[in-house]
UniProtKB/Swiss-Prot annotation:
InterPro entries: Nucleotide-diphossugar_trans. Belongs to the glycosyltransferase 2 family. This is Glucosyl-3-phosphoglycerate synthase. Keywords: Cobalt, Glycosyltransferase, Magnesium, Manganese, Metal-binding, Nickel, Transferase. It comes from the Bacteria. Coiled coil: none annotated. One of its GO terms (molecular function) is glycosyltransferase activity. Its cofactor is Mn(2+); Co(2+); Mg(2+); Ni(2+). Requires divalent cations for activity in the following order of efficiency: Mn(2+), Co(2+), Mg(2+) and Ni(2+) ions.
Amino acid sequence: MADFFQNGVITTLQNFRNRSLEELEYELELFSKRRNMVLLLPALYSEFEGPAMPKIIQELKDIRYLYKIVLSLDRATEEEFKKVKKIMSEINTEVKVIWHDGPRMQRLYRELEEAGFNVSIPGKGRSVWMSLGYILSDADAYAIALHDCDIVNYSRELPARLLYPVVHPALDFEFSKGYYARVTHKLYGRVTRIFYTPLIRALIRILGCNRFLVYLDSFRYALSGEFAFIRTLARGIRISPTWGLEVSMLSEVYQNTSFNRICQVEVMDTYEHKHQKLVKSTSEGLVKMASDIAKTLFRVLAHDGFVFSEAFFRTLLTTYLQEARYAIEKYNALSLINGLTYDRHAEIEAIEVFVDALKKAEKEFIEDPIGVPLMSAWVRVRAALPEISDKLIRAVEEDNSDD
């Protein structure tokens, strides 16, 4: 039986697999006559040397409903930037490559820094933020979809299903979040399965049915990097430069729109990308990600007026451990009935590492409750620097016109 269950406070749009991709894309082509759609692809140059990017480019060649594709390129030399431009020129849709390491973009980053905007931390968050600024400079762009560029089994169904809810004229969604299964011969998505979700549920047990926490618990894959939103929402969104990007994005959406305009969409059957090993260092990898996520949660809740004490954090640690143990029991049963490999010992070891990440997050939050500020919404940036949009357009155009 197809899954049609609606849980939580947002709408869930499952894939019943009874409709062809071609039919979906045909509708999107009709919608594109009135609502221009932009696809934003944050990428490192190294991803062009891996197995995922060639497949993504091949799939994008067949899309006809997109107004523009913006590739946000990080960690690339001039030669590598030129190589990427040539590769992306194979796509029929108009493509603009934003070279964040180039001298023109670096000048803009310095100008923003001098004006008091926090853009000093390089990474995906900053690149996405600057790329959004470029896209929003085009008044004809209506909806923006974003997905990562390390998806080995990529299908053009992903952007189609992400964009459909926010551009369909008979629907009223402003934000859609992608979800999928992270399954091969075993379950992946450890940070979501045995850290994020147990932590959210531990917080609910302690703080009660807080609307924000219930909202976060409604997402099937809150840490996915795939989402779409309309420009009027995007222009008021602040973005985190840290690993807390996805959680802070959901927080900003929560504050800037209403539940009935938020949905989650099943975009793929399964999702394969590069898997990170769980190292015990709290300053890198998945543990750093978990720590940043926890700090982001604490700060958002503190903004809502919650007071955190030493007793609260002691209770949270033990409650999280209990919720994580419940999760292990559930995923062990799920793996057994589906014939998957499930290493309970490795999962328990991962929880112990995540407890260290949680302790680190608590310590850093107490020492610095404000932490790394979110990068300002573009509506504020434009108010302070009225010419920034023109400068951004000029920098990208000149970079893309150079031989």
